[in-house]
UniProtKB/Swiss-Prot annotation:
InterPro entries: Ribosomal_mS34. Component of the mitochondrial ribosome small subunit (28S) which comprises a 12S rRNA and about 30 distinct proteins. GO terms for molecular function: structural constituent of ribosome. Its main location: mitochondrion. This is Small ribosomal subunit protein mS34.
Amino acid sequence: MARRKVRPRLIAELARRVRALREQRERPRDSVRYALDYETLIRPHSGRKLPLRAWVDVRRESRLLQLLGRLPFFGLGRLVTRKSWLWQHDEPCYWRLTRVRPDYTAQNLDHGKAWGILTFKGKTESEAREIEQVMHHDWRLVPKHEEAAFTSFTPAPEETPRPVPYPPLLRAMILAERQKNGDPSTEEPMLSLERIRTDPWDYPENQEAKKKTKGTAV
């Protein structure tokens, strides 16, 4: 029986997977990548110094895994938020933790990964996903007795703006275009003022989409 030949594409795909596995094994753990010398505020692995605006938060605030390491079961089911969200948004912004995987090679179990369901500006996502920027020093734990008040939110009624007439020059151009195209419509052209809704700049998914991160992780 003739031996079946292996397609070159399958060999290339296998080699790609082997390279990816080696890179993953050789990649330094988060406890090494994000280790910080609190005296010089330099990360030993990269040799980079934290930006000036992060110095105060590094000494006063905590990383996410630093908070969760003090709680039973690493705080599963608890609510965590960020100081920047509390300052910038009036609507509730928080993560409800569903899964935590600490880095057991870290000295104080203060590094690792976490997953949760995001509520941003009062809108809750349907599925849990990995929490980004867990190494930043601006995470805060919502006390249990304050969770009900923190999550309560009544959205304000949205008012649909009324359309307004076009400026005279634009109106004349639109009517001339209609006449040129043979449009017999006599409807007055109106300008809609309805806003196109976009996610805020600090929405976590928008930050994940950025391929190039400026500066050093706080």
